């Protein structure tokens, strides 16, 4: 997305003795002199733009003080001195990013030392060592893309440094190239002995690549940030841990509180220690303790365990408990977080909650009807959905089995009050989830999703749901051409390259899944049985902006439909191709709807199609099967999107600038597409500065800064933020892509306080009803609120932070 200007590719020629013919660079380490030259080059570039680096307070570097530590310290002082000014200077933002990458390089070690210090598994280390010369070739290719990568942005560089690069002994770091190499090597190792995986990596099916070709393919896709792995893979790929699964769905069927506590000890805690995000259903069995607070006490125990675990974990985990709205404790659950929790004994601030919403509740709400709560005598309702659920629910009402009755609107408004005050509950629609599943779920309905509401997966006595994720960076597939002077460049989306990457990503995540360690036996069973994967996207809004249109445009609607059709078609073709090449379909395929020619999109008969190939795919699936039971999931990507500096997942940008105060000053992330557009429109520095200052005074809202002064087709009008976007239109986009998303999508709602500081519950209720009528599986992930008096996003306590466990667990 940006051109490189200065960073010299890392290659240092300090060699030690090595065997004849081996790649010398394998033993090479960075040198202070090399990095000092890079630093001087960048300092000169900063001075040319008016930033006097000598004023940062750093001592001058000379022959006697030229150490790695001194270089790193000088870089830190320069960054802290000028980072607040990036809001007015995109090039400064990129130059400071390059400085961070030099600081990273002051802490790196040679490839040989990295293999010894990183804690790689024996198998991954051997895979790399057997290919020393080829690895050196890969690092040369990395040197060609590293200048561009190092200029993605300051936020990206700092995220690599602080979180994703492996920490070695004595304060050393793995390099960015080693980071990508580790992930690619582990995935290639999963392909090395699987000819079907290797052949399926190319869409044309005419090539049978060797392990090195696949290794290179994975490596370059990662370096170019086309494929962005989830956080578990980035942290643990190739290590002894091998914890690659992102999502676990557990169904706890306890007859007593002690049964739930046993399950916590035997299954939930091991999964938490594997750093996976958890979606949990807790049964409302007839034999729960007579004390009506039994479930709440169990939840409190679980909440305390989550808090204790995260307090000592380098990577926090998160857990979401799914409850149906007829549950006897529903009103208590809606008052157990944040400012709504009046009783410390039942406060559960570390636990997320979600409502597994039956259609009948939404119908009762719309009709202004009543809603009945039940105890464990109605536990079997959890196994039913659709008409079966409605008939049984109404029968129980007629038999007076209920323990309390409320106006349905009271329950809905309690839900909304909790959502806007504390961040939860999330909302998923039970009927839409089960109706569109590839198995007939009559009498055995699915009861929960995952932590982030985008995974649909069955559980039973023998297995829990497991899903392995990855995402595609859509901005990486936008090819931009030079525009006329004074106009921003307009990009074109490369569907061919995107579909190639879809095939690579499908094999990539399957390869990692085949090597993954899982924390409990039921997870291993679930993983081996269904091989569920979720391939999603990040940068949807950014890709729209780079193509010259906003989310509310006709072009965005067309792009949305075509993009996700391409994603679904290609991933399913690849999964089918793996079976055609000799691998067995997922267990239970012959009993699935797929075996009869069904596809997920058949639930939306009015869909529009852009691509040929669906009819042939149906026939091939019937003939050969599918290796994976599900393939497309649109997860939030709050953490990994900071590496690519694109918009999160399918979501619009929160604001055109992100800012937080730290101990070293203000850290800022820019909307690079907006800054590039402003630079093109206003080449005069003084005029451009005036425009940026105007935006700053209006909280970086182009609508607030310019209002009606901008013509409707002006390039800046497309930069509306999430809170300025038409929420019904965002839901329409979700509905249009829904046929091609066989898992689900983390649908977030964005609302703004009224001038009196209130959030209108009727507004949120209308959006939930709209999502329900569109047939979405996820009605509401987060409900994010912007204060009327501020542009900062808040969510009750601090659940909107970018280190939120819900963000880290998935992506």
Curated annotation (Swiss-Prot):
Residue numbers marked as site, Important for electron transfer: 781-782
Protein keywords: ATP-binding, Disulfide bond, DNA replication, Early protein, Host-virus interaction, Nucleotide-binding, Oxidoreductase, Viral latency, Viral reactivation from latency
Positions of the record's site feature: Interacts with thioredoxin/glutaredoxin: 807, 810
Biological processes per GO annotation: deoxyribonucleotide biosynthetic process; DNA replication; release from viral latency
UniProt-listed Pfam families: Ribonuc_red_lgC, Ribonuc_red_lgN
Residues marked Important for hydrogen atom transfer (site): 247, 467
Disulphide bridges: 247-467
SUPFAM superfamilies per the UniProt record, alphabetical: PFL-like glycyl radical enzymes
Reactions catalysed according to its record: a 2'-deoxyribonucleoside 5'-diphosphate + [thioredoxin]-disulfide + H2O = a ribonucleoside 5'-diphosphate + [thioredoxin]-dithiol
Residues making up the signal peptide according to the UniProt record: none
GO terms for MF: ATP binding; ribonucleoside-diphosphate reductase activity, thioredoxin disulfide as acceptor
EC number: 1.17.4.1
Active site: 450, 452, 454
Residues the entry annotates as binding substrate: 231, 246-247, 277, 450-454, 636-640
Function according to Swiss-Prot or TrEMBL: Ribonucleoside-diphosphate reductase holoenzyme provides the precursors necessary for viral DNA synthesis. Allows virus growth in non-dividing cells, as well as reactivation from latency in infected hosts. Catalyzes the biosynthesis of deoxyribonucleotides from the corresponding ribonucleotides.
Subunit structure: Heterotetramer composed of a homodimer of the large subunit (R1) and a homodimer of the small subunit (R2). Larger multisubunit protein complex are also active, composed of (R1)n(R2)n.
Family as reported in the entry's similarity comment: Belongs to the ribonucleoside diphosphate reductase large chain family.
Protein name per the record: Ribonucleoside-diphosphate reductase large subunit
Designated gene of the protein: RIR1
């Amino acid at each position: 997305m940006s051109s490189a200007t200065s960073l010299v590719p890392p290659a240092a020629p300090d060699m030690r003795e090595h065997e004849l013919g081996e790649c010398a660079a394998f033993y090479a380490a960075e040198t202070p002199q090399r990095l000092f030259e890079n630093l001087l080059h960048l300092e000169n570039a900063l001075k040319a733009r008016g930033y006097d680096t000598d004023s940062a307070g750093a001592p001058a570097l000379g022959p006697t003080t030229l150490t790695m530590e001194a270089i790193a310290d000088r870089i830190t002082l320069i960054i802290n001195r000028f980072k607040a000014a990036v809001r007015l200077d995109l090039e400064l933002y990129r130059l400071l990013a390059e400085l961070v990458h030099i600081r990273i390089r002051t802490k790196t070690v040679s490839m040989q030392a990295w293999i010894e210090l990183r804690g790689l598994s024996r198998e991954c280390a051997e895979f790399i060592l057997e290919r020393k010369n080829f690895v050196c070739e890969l690092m040369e290719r990395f040197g060609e893309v590293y200048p561009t990568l190092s200029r993605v942005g300051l936020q990206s560089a700092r995220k690599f440094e602080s979180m994703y690069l492996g920490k070695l002994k004595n304060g050393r770091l793995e390099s960015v190239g080693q980071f990508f190499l580790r992930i690619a090597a582990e995935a290639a190792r999963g392909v090395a002995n699987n000819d079907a995986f290797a052949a399926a990596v190319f869409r044309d099916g005419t090539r049978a690549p060797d392990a090195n070709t696949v290794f290179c393919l994975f490596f370059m896709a990662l370096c170019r940030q086309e494929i962005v792995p989830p956080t578990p893979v980035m942290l643990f790929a190739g290590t002894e841990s091998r914890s690659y699964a992102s999502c676990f769905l557990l169904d706890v069927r306890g007859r007593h509180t002690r049964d739930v506590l046993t399950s916590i000890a035997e299954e939930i805690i091991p999964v938490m220690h594997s750093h996976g995000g958890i979606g949990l259903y807790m049964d409302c069995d007839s034999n729960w303790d007579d004390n009506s607070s039994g479930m709440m006490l169990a939840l409190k125990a679980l909440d305390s365990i989550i808090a204790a675990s995260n307090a000592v974990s380098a990577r926090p985990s998160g857990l979401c408990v799914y409850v149906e709205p007829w549950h006897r404790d529903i009103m208590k659950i809606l008052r157990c977080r944040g400012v709504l929790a009046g009783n410390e004994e039942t406060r559960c601030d570390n636990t997320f909650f979600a409502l597994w919403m039956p259609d009948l509740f939404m119908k009762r709400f719309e009709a202004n009807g009543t809603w009945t709560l039940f105890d464990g005598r109605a536990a079997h309702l959890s196994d039913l959905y659709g008409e079966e659920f409605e008939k049984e629910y109404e029968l129980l009402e007629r038999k007076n089995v209920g323990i309390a009755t409320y106006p349905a609107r009271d329950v809905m408004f309690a839900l909304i009050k909790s959502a806007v005050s504390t961040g939860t509950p999330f909302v998923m629609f039970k009927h839409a989830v089960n109706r569109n599943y590839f198995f007939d779920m009559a009498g055995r309905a699915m009861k929960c999703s995952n932590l982030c509401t985008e995974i649909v997966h069955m559980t039973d006595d023998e297995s829990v749901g497991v899903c392995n994720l990855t995402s595609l960076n859509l901005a990486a597939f936008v090819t931009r051409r030079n525009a006329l002077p004074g106009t921003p460049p307009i990009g074109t989306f490369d569907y061919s390259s995107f579909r190639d990457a879809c095939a690579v990503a499908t094999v990539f995540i399957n390869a990692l899944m085949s090597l993954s360690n899982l924390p409990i036996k039921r997870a291993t069973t679930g993983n081996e049985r269904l091989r569920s994967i979720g391939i999603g996207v990040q940068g949807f809004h950014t890709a729209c902006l780079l193509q010259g249109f906003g989310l509310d445009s006709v072009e965005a609607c067309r792009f949305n439909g075509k993009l996700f059709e391409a994603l679904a078609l290609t991933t399913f073709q690849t999964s089918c191709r793996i079976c055609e090449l000799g691998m067995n379909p997922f267990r239970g395929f012959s009993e699935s709807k797929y075996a009869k020619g069904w596809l997920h999109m058949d639930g939306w008969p009015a869909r529009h199609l852009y691509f040929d190939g669906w009819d042939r795919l149906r026939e091939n699936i019937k003939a050969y099967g599918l290796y994976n039971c599900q393939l497309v999931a649109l997860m939030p990507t709050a953490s990994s999107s900071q590496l690519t500096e694109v918009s999160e997942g399918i979501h619009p940008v929160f604001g055109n600038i992100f800012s937080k105060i730290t101990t070293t000053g203000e850290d800022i992330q820019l909307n690079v597409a907006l800054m590039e557009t402003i630079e093109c429109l206003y080449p005069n520095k003084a005029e451009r500065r005036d425009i940026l200052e105007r935006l700053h005074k209006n909280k970086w809202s182009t609508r607030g800064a310019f209002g009606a002064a901008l013509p409707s087709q002006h390039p800046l009008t497309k930069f509306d933020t999430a809170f300025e976007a038409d929420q019904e239109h965002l839901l329409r986009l979700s509905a249009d892509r829904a046929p091609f998303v066989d898992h689900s999508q983390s649908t977030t709602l964005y609302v703004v306080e009224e001038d009196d500081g209130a959030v209108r519950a009727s507004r949120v209720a209308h959006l939930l009803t709209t999502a329900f009528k569109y047939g979405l599986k996820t009605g509401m992930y987060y409900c994010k609120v912007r204060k009327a008096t501020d542009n900062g996003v808040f969510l009750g306590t601090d659940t909107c932070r970018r280190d939120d466990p819900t963000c880290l667990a998935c992506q």
